[in-house]
Every structure is written in C-alpha cells, then in structure tokens.
C-alpha cells in the first residue's frame, strides 16, 4: 500500500505540452507542489534546458538556479522543479531577459520574450471571493494568491493586474462581452478572441462564445476563459500568431508561401 506523496513521474505520463522525447530517459522531472497544477505547469528545468537550451543536463540547471539568477514573478527560485504556469514572469538577471508564460495556439507554453516594463506586472484571474475572519474580504486568484481588501467591484471571473514589486492590485478588467480573452483550457487552448456572449446554465457550467480576429467563432466553458484586455486591446503582448488558430490547409499554404519567398 502506497503511503505519502508520489515523488516520481514517468516520461510517458508527463504532460504532452512539455514536449519531452519518450526515448531519452525513463523519468521526467516531477514538479514540486506550488501555485499551478501538475498538468498545467512547466517546471523550471524544462524551461531552461529544453526550451531555452541554456543547459544540457539537470545538474547544469541546478548550478544556474543555485546561483540565484532565476526569478519568477520577482522572487528568486532555486528549486529546479518549481512549477511555473500561465502568466508567470520568468526573469534572468544575468542576460537581462524576461519571459511571460502564455500558450500558443497548439496549447503549448511559448517562449515569449517581453520588455522590462511589461515584466513589472502580471494578470491574474479571480477564482473566488470570500469573507475571512472579522469580516475581511479576500480574493483568490488562479495562481493561488490571496489578496485582502480588494475593490468591491471586482467579481469572480474578472481579471486583476498585479504589480509584482508590491503584490498589490493596480487595476482590473471586468468579465464582459466585447472584451478580449485567451482560452486557458479545453480543445481551444491558446486561442485569443473577443467574448460575444455568455450562456448561463444554473447548476452547470456557463458557456462562453468567442470570436477571433479572423471571424471564426467557437465556444468553451467559462472556467477556460481568461480576460486579457478591455475591448479588443490586450494588456499583455501576445506570442507569434496572436492567438489565431489556422486550419491545416491554411498552415500548409503559409508554409509553402514562406518556402517560395525564401527559395
């Protein structure tokens, strides 16, 4: 009988979006417990070794982290299996680089470089609002932050902008039709579009209809929607492709056009 937490993760069972080869080993890094779920995070080691190619082995990643070069959301992290997740800002002081973890249209975390100015804040989705001891209102975000005394106008599913230096809310975006959003779960993961309407289903999941910049419409659960800007202007920079998913035929035509122009 197994007692206690699981400490290993087989490569075959690792999330697909980490893009680890099946045959290069038996095990994958098991993310530590942290603000993001195992299936929805990217361990620091995978980001530094497999994405940025700054290290060849896990030992090298450890040496980089132990020199306190890597910051996530403005805090130094030395744990190589720390689970970084959606909207987290990863800063590497030594190279002066800043990255934000956002999904591409294939549902993988894109290596998305951002400016120093943009690295000072992040957006968080409001998961729940509760009243704590002595009637103090609390707000809980998607990355497990608890913020006391929020603006009473902020409701669940809204998005708050957090200053990473102070951890305080600087602004917020209402969940409303006409606002631009990103899909953070389900089959449409990584797509960006404008909320067109919300179907309410009491006792079940509300369904949200979204229209992307090419005019394609799709629907998903409200829990998969993350509002990223007012109107159709996002508050963060988007990775290449701007969250517009192409059909297989469109991708092929784009590839052929690129080939002809370079050839």
Curated annotation (Swiss-Prot):
InterPro entries: KOW, Rib_uL2_dom2, Ribosomal_eS4, Ribosomal_eS4_C, Ribosomal_eS4_central_region, Ribosomal_eS4_central_sf, Ribosomal_eS4_KOW, Ribosomal_eS4_N. CDD domains: KOW_RPS4, S4. GO terms for cellular component: cytosolic small ribosomal subunit. PROSITE patterns: RIBOSOMAL_S4E, S4. GO terms for biological process: translation. GO terms for molecular function: RNA binding; rRNA binding; structural constituent of ribosome. The keyword Repressor does not apply. It comes from the Eukaryota. Keywords: Ribonucleoprotein, Ribosomal protein, RNA-binding, rRNA-binding. Residues 42-104 form the S4 RNA-binding domain. PANTHER family: 30S/40S RIBOSOMAL PROTEIN S4 (PTHR11581), SMALL RIBOSOMAL SUBUNIT PROTEIN ES4, Y ISOFORM 2 (PTHR11581:SF7). Belongs to the eukaryotic ribosomal protein eS4 family. This is Small ribosomal subunit protein eS4, Y isoform 2.
